[in-house]
Amino acid sequence: MKLRISDAPFPGAPVMVMISGLGGLGGYWLAQQNALSQAYQVVVYDQRGTGDNADTLPEGYTLTDMAQELHRALALHGVQRYAVLGHALGGLVGLELALAYPRAVSALVIINGWLSLGTWTRRCFDARERLLLDSGPAVYVAAQPLFLYPPQWAQENQPRLEAEEALQNAHFQGTENLLRRLWALKTADYRERAARVTTPVQLICARDDVLVPWTCSQALHEALPHSRLDVMTSGGHACNVTAPQRFNSLLYAGLAALTPAPHKETV
């Protein structure tokens, strides 16, 4: 698996692995990547079956598979310990990593995640799946902003949405891959395992997320033994994209509380 690893900002800098959501592309993190690279060696990547890591996913592909693939790829690059920043699906992959490799994951930040798939989010995913199967990839991609962004932000950023739509159509991961990734996402359930997570976790969510209700993060917070919950008043499902300054401020505060502050050694 191909990873994009930035130069360490100073010797011994901690590593931050950024895992995107269902779309799978590492480019999702532009608004955080540059800022975090001042204090972390940042790792971004396109998930298996997407972008630079094109592949045909097997039937029965799971989030556990996604976590194992990433952990192996990091080990091949000599990365033994790292923090994880994950959005939705990416945050759940982070939970899988924390459960399977607790000594490797120093901290975990989950954006708009959940303990188990709620009825509303399942309805949204089922509707998107029907769009994909009945109307094709172009219609699926065109509808995606309805679930990701607040209406006012979307209206004010129409040129950006058009550019994103063109890019997503050009690099569409394929119907079968997307359906298998959706299946992995919909079947993940942490109700029986969350209490075993020893990694400190920050949960960030937005009250106006129309895809994943913010109360899903609240339920996850209550189930995790070592977590903090930060609720943004607005920003939608992709709140780190639509409100990066507010999001980054919460992220930095959370990371400071979860882990020792990264710093350059002085002599």
UniProtKB/Swiss-Prot annotation:
What enzyme category does the UniProt record give? hydrolase
GO BP annotation list:
nitrogen utilization; uracil catabolic process
Q: Write down the Gene3D superfamilies for this protein, in alphabetical order.
A: alpha/beta hydrolase
Pfam families noted in UniProt: Abhydrolase_1 (PF00561)
| Family note | Belongs to the AB hydrolase superfamily. Hydrolase RutD family.
Q: What does this protein do?
A: Involved in pyrimidine catabolism. May facilitate the hydrolysis of carbamate, a reaction that can also occur spontaneously.
Q: Name one GO molecular function term.
A: hydrolase activity, acting on carbon-nitrogen (but not peptide) bonds, in linear amides
Record EC number: 3.5.1.-
Q: Which reaction does it catalyse?
A: carbamate + 2 H(+) = NH4(+) + CO2
Q: Which residues form the AB hydrolase-1 domain?
A: 14-115
Question: InterPro entries of this UniProt entry?
Answer: AB_hydrolase_1 (IPR000073), AB_hydrolase_fold (IPR029058), AB_hydrolase_sf (IPR050266), Pyrimidine_utilisation_RutD (IPR019913)
Note whether Hydrolase occurs among the keywords: yes
**What name is this protein filed under?**
Putative carbamate hydrolase RutD
The alphabetical list of record keywords is: Hydrolase
Decide whether keyword Transmembrane is in the record: no
